[in-house]
């Protein structure tokens, strides 16, 4: 384990002493260090009647147990302090470590022995081997009462609200959209779990079209066959209009009642970060949105009608919209428990909705935590004029996603009444998708949140993985740079795939978010501020560094690609084409081994480099016909240890999200030997070689100069490493599979790779 502590806040000494005293650690600033440590430890072991026993089973050094040490005349030393501290954090002395000073350096332990009271205070705020901070572990065990009131420690809310005796209710928010054109505003179901409290509390909201269930069978039937020819497009410039949103006004009167009338029972799933905040005094709201089970309307996936309906939930929390007790719309209930302040959470589609909500500039949305969220839907299902699929899901497109998320069809009555209209709406969607050309058009323009990024007022926290080929890193990169300069923005850029990171051992993500939300939603005045970029170092396990920016580098490193011309044959023998189509993983393996139709160029790294931004290929290229699909991947090549893209379980159900509440696995990205690691990749329709909005002819056998930017990333390379550039046509995981007989030729002498460093 390595310690990477970003959540700790430096407080004045008087605050430290006061907070310690409130937790029963009655330490005196004038006492000697040894006496203070003993006083601290006897309170620490509050679950024991006889505190001599737990002291006797800890060690001060290799020859002395801690009780014997306290009974001796020996002085407290730095070595003894560290030895005790590591044991309190769950490390076994003489098993996990033998020399505390060596272990301190190996783990990057954040505490430097000096002022003992401040050391002990920071120790309580440090994560244990099993994933909780020490103070959270003690609170979970009953250090302070579960009194349904707020208690703070180091600028973070503690788990002092009951997660057993909570209010579980359902309301139906009246949205400002009428997606199915029935002349009535759509209703959106809101599932609420909130702690009991006499005053007003903030809300954690997760906007998830998946929450009420998904129609997997209908979605699977809607998948597309990827084996189609690349379309030869007519040259033209794409014209677009400003997206429009038509809102509807509230209708009718509704009796105001004191409380919701529908009780929330079982929910399909919760997000463990939300579970963590519930006993800390934050309401949990789960909203599936229009077109989902128990709500009304069509599934409009990604457009501002869908976003508006989610926004209206925040409006209700602030008294600007109504919520009914049921579908009759006869009785309404106010969110009189809400302080109006909201943070949004969730990954993938959930993080996408956070991005979209932020771009409305809605009052009350204080923080978004957008994890692996889409910023422009075109870049999810298309790329540079090509029809593509999100990584791992070949054949998926917008209409199959609509079938997946239109969970109203899971209710037989809704299916009978509404499926015909839903299918008619889907036909319109299919026509607008333009799966034939892969071009950007008005349909995608209406689902581009970057156009409204200037409206964002909330503080923004992103998480994204360098190995996320589902929602590719371009999404967070573009959103990060499109945000107004005056707002606070932060990015946790890890080396995983499309995954959550709130339960990783190496980073205090939950505690950092706690510090942020306690400040922004609960009004605690602290100077807590996350760095702009927190980046997971790819060269070592469990190592995180603070960076000033993502991209925007002034310097670059250029690699020439060779001296000759090389060709990429597009067509495969039928046997190989069928084999790769059945299992794209086989294609990826053979591509990395140099066995596919490809140009492979090994590039020695002659000095240490820190890639930060978008690698760019400048290629002189020609096609043997009037079309061309170009794929590129940049690998670090060579057998060595690399971080793996999916977290592994270190210990099962050891993270406590409250007081024995929603126990969670502790995980981490493994660091183990592999033959290569993907650094970045990209895909390009050569007819869109100069601009996404400009379609140009390709003349057979005529040279073209192409500037091709790959996916943004942050990646460290060392002198002696090897980069491998792979150029090819069809990618059996991502692109359409055109097996026509043509080839691309690259003049390597007139081509180069540029890395921003």
Curated annotation (Swiss-Prot):
Its EC number is 3.4.14.11. It is an enzyme of class 3 (hydrolase). One of its GO terms (molecular function) is serine-type peptidase activity. The keyword Transferase does not apply. The keyword Hydrolase applies. Keywords: Aminopeptidase, Cytoplasm, Hydrolase, Protease, Serine protease. It catalyses: Hydrolyzes Xaa-Pro-|- bonds to release unblocked, N-terminal dipeptides from substrates including Ala-Pro-|-p-nitroanilide and (sequentially) Tyr-Pro-|-Phe-Pro-|-Gly-Pro-|-Ile. SUPFAM superfamilies: alpha/beta-Hydrolases, Galactose-binding domain-like, X-Prolyl dipeptidyl aminopeptidase PepX, N-terminal domain. GO terms for biological process: proteolysis. It is found in: Cytoplasm. Gene3D superfamilies: 1.10.246.70, alpha/beta hydrolase, Galactose-binding domain-like. Homodimer. Removes N-terminal dipeptides sequentially from polypeptides having unsubstituted N-termini provided that the penultimate residue is proline. PANTHER family: COCE_NOND FAMILY, PUTATIVE (AFU_ORTHOLOGUE AFUA_7G00600)-RELATED, PEPTIDASE S9 PROLYL OLIGOPEPTIDASE. This is Xaa-Pro dipeptidyl-peptidase. It comes from Streptococcus pneumoniae (strain ATCC 700669 / Spain 23F-1). The lineage of its organism: Bacteria, Bacillati, Bacillota, Bacilli, Lactobacillales.
